[in-house]
Structures are given as structure tokens and as C-alpha cells.
Amino acid sequence: MTTKTMRAIFTPQALAAAVALGCCAQAQAVAFNIGEIEGTFDSSLSVGASWGMRDADKSLVGTVNGGTGQSSTGDDGRLNFKKGETFSKIVKGIHDLELKYGDTGVFVRGKYWYDFELKDEDREFKPISDKGRKEGAKSSGAQILDAFVYHNYSIADLPGTVRAGKQVVSWGESTFIGNSINSINPIDVSAFRRPGAEIKEGLIPVNMLFGSQGLTDQFTVEGFYQLEWDQTVLDNCGTFFGVDVAADGCNNGYTVGNPAIAPLVPLTTAFGQGIQVTREGVVIPRGGDRDARDSGQWGTALRWLGDDTEYGLYFMNYHSRTPTVGTTTAGLSTLAALPGMVGIANGLAPGSGSGLAQSVMLGRGGYYLEYPEDIRLYGASFSTTLPTGTAWTGEISYRPNAPVQVNTNDLTLALLNPIAGGTASPIATTPGSDNKGYRRKEVTQIQSTLTHFFDQVWGAQRLTLVGEAAVVRVGGLESRSKLRYGRDSVYGQYGFGGDTDGFVTSTSWGYRARAILDYANVIGGINLKPNLSWSHDVAGYGPNGLFNEGAKAISVGVDADYRNTYTASLSYTDFFGGDYNVLEDRDFVALSFGVNF
């Protein structure tokens, strides 16, 4: 259950957004009574599968694994699945229970899943493990999602509601594009990857207090205070969309350098500076995650309903739900041991000392994931209907201290600065120090959405068109010769092969669009919804992967349902375009069947 004001829930704009996101009507929930307690129980069961439709792009695979890319930290998922192979084969269920006594109630939602492909099948390149993973990233599991109590009341005939417990609160008017005002809850990325996924499966409820109170017939104030912090669930390493180094428990995938140094590993151990070398290179050890604290997350909103338009003002203080990557430079003891190791290495294999020194500095360094705290967000939104019947919404958000990820190649090369006279990376470092993976920047984002319904089109009862565009401005960026942000490590360090593009720019923009045709009662009560989705990052490179110039995606699909009870969905998604698009070889087909009761 997503928490919004009652007024917001029933606006045409909210309905249009739900349609655009592909939400379909559920069958009538099972209703029951226990004395004066009213209850409903709603269930969805589904089976599905997904297949990869392209071979791995060699330019996105590291050289140590037969490709031409400058990093191997994204190789596991690419080399685990060939073209045409199944990368997910899943059965899952989700259940909602609501109990009401007068104006007071309890809502609980839970889900479970089992992916036979990831759980039971062997992988060609590297095994996929659930050990140490977040529950949502595992190949099989069960979770309680929402679990809260609520009470509806009136003060002087002005409605109000309070909620306490695990819940989702949605603010703002964003439909497709992230980094918006709607940043209260983290996302379960793994859940959204599964065939047949529903919106409610991928939003992570968080323990919080929420309240909404009408001040007049036109003004409503809302607020929340989170009782805990939680993080976005990332794809498990080795899965089709996963990277090797980010998810919880993926601790040995940050490999760099030349694996040919392996014969000299015993020498490093003898000097008390042992390192780990695999077939992919030197392992940079993962340190403990720097999780955000539970306290200090709160927000307030003021809504004004005019004659034809609803306006909103927002403020939030929250901690990042997505991680930044930082590194830790090897300590003084490692530097002190280097001359002895290098001398012996050169005696054993002339010229090998330099490579050994670099490998030791990398292998005795480390990396960590950090979740920056106390991000401030100021926002404003509007929602209206134009004379044409088109729903028009928009919002602006401003974060004066948003964390922006520093280029990870520069962070890795910073580990070599103590033996390179500070010239390996523009990031200054000292032995034993942390190299913070982000800098705080002013980030402003403006976005707008149009939704229109056309009746009786191409034999369909309705055609729904939704389009959303956004522009992002990042203030205070340094020149690229001083510090770079963003860009995947597979493209190498700044200036490699003369390439100096692809890093975060001060301005970036893109748009998303979706079209849905509704064919009712096509054959024997079966309803069909052919749909087309389009994504285009037009210009610039946004912070933290928001926009990637030239990157495009198209998805063609059809959804079917019978009496709002039995469902089926088939879609094909193609990623293409852009010079720095790591998704361009991740095309896939998804098929699912479900039942709602």
C-alpha cells in the first residue's frame, strides 16, 4: 500500500501514472468479517522466465577475460549467460491482508519467490551465491513488505490520517525518471528485474511515522519521520544485470592489474604483505560498508488544491539509499616493505619489481561502499488538466548537497599515488587514508509529464500516451583535468586512447514515453493491451548514471488478462546507442503468467 493523501490518490493524473506504469486491475479481493472487524485478503501468483538476446559485447568485457574493455568488474553476469540462454526462471507470490475496525486498521503485505535458474543451475563462468546477500537479492526468499497500523479521523470536519510502521510514502509527480522528489523509499532493483514484476514488489517499505491533516478545504499538510534507514537492493553479482563488486556479499570481484604476478605472491606473504591474485588480476579487498544512521530522516509537505490545479511544496532531509564507492590506500607498513620485495623480485625475474610494487599497493589497499547522510531536498510540484483533457504534471527539485560519484578508475589509481609521486590519479592521498568516493554538489532537476487518453483508436477502446522529460543541472563541477565524475570503469582512465568524454556534465537531459492500446473482450472475455515504451538520453551525462548521452531503449510487449483474474505478459527490450552505454548488450525477452484472487 502506497501512502498518499486521499485527494491525490483519486486524481486523474495519479490514475494516468498508474496506467503508464503498466499497473493492471486486480481481481476482487477475498472479503471476510470477524465480528465487527472487516477484512480483505488479496493474492497474486505468477510464473515467468527471461532470456538474453545478445552475446556479450567484447568491448564491455575485460582483456583478462578475452575482451577489449579496461575493467573486468562487470564480466561475471555477461560471461555467465550466452545469447538465447535463460537468465531467470521464477515462481513468486505476493499477498495483502487488511483488517479494519471502524476508522482504524492494519495492513500487511508479504512476498516470496524461487528462481530455479539462478538457484539450481550451474553457471559457465562463476557461480551465483546467496551467501551474505540482502534478502531481496537472493535467488529465493521471503519478505514482509508493508506492515503498518493506521487511523483516519476528522478535526472540525477536516480529514486526517496517521500511520505507523513499514510503509511506502510517495511524493511529487515523477512517473518514469528517477532522482525526483519521490525519494523517501529505497528500491528493490532485483525485484523489478523479475519477469511479471509489479510496482508494489519493488518499493521497499521503511519503518516510519506518517501523518496527513487537512488545514482547510484547500490546504493539506503532511509529514514523515523515518525510524530506520534502509538501502536499495542491488542486483546480485553474476546475475544478468549485476556488477561484480557492489551487492552485499560480493567481496572478491574488484580485480585489477596483471594476473601474471601470481608467482610472486609467496614473496609478499613472506614480508607480511600478502595479496590475493586470481585469474582476473589482483583482488582489491572490500572493507566494511559505511551504512547511514537510522536517525535524522524526516520531511514535510504542503499541498494546495486550487480551482483546477494541485500544487505541492516539499522539504526532506534523508540519507542516500544508493552507495558510493571509495578506496583506502595501503598503509606505511606496506610502503616500508616494498624496497625489500622489489629487490628480491628483480633478482628472481629482472624487471618484475615495478609490477610487484603496483600489485602490492593495490592488493593491500581496499574499497568500501558508503551511503552519504543528511541530503537536503527542496521541491515544488503541480498537477492539472489542460482544456484538451491532457493531464499535465511537473516538479522541480533542488539538492544543495547531493553526493556525486567520483570516477572509479581515478579512485583505484589513487592507490598507486604514494609510489608514483602523486601522478597516477588527481585524487590526493596519503598512506592508510580513505579516498572518499563522492563530492557534494548542487543538483537541480526539472521534469514534466503529459498523459492523454484517445478513445476508439485502431479498433481499440482506448489509446493511452504518456511522455516525461527531465533536465538536470549540476553546479560546481571541477574541470576534467582536475577531477572527473561518473563513467564506467570498463572505458578506462581519463585520456586512455585519447578518450576524455563520458563523464558527468553540468547539464543533461532525456525523455521517456509509453503507449498502451486497450482491446476489451477480444476473444471470450480476454482483454489485450499491446504496449510500446521508449527511452532516450538526449544530451549530457547525468550524476550517478541518471542520463547517458545517446543511450536509447525500446520495449515492445503485450499484456493479456481474463476477467481480471488470469494474466499473461510478453515483452522484448532492446538497449542501444550511446558511446558509454554498458546496457547495449543486455537485450532480453520476458514472459510471465499469473493469477490474481
Language model features: what each stretch is:
Residues 28-41, 54-56, 97-106, 150-163, ...:
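Short loop/turn motifs that connect adjacent beta-strands in outer-membrane beta-barrel proteins
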Residues 40, 92-96, 146-148, 208, ...:
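Membrane-embedded beta-strand positions in outer-membrane beta-barrel channels/transporters
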Residues 47-53, 103, 112-116, 166-170, ...:
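Transmembrane beta-strands of outer-membrane beta-barrel pores
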Residues 57-78, 119-135, 185-194, 235-286, ...:
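Solvent-exposed loop segments that connect transmembrane elements
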Residues 84-89, 136-141, 198-203, 290-294, ...:
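Short sequence motifs at beta-strands and strand-loop junctions characteristic
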Residues 86-90, 316-318, 323, 393, ...:
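Detector for outer-membrane/organellar transmembrane beta-barrel domains
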Residues 100-251, 510, 539, 547-552, ...:
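Outer membrane beta-barrel
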Residues 585-597:
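Outer-membrane beta-barrel "beta-signal"
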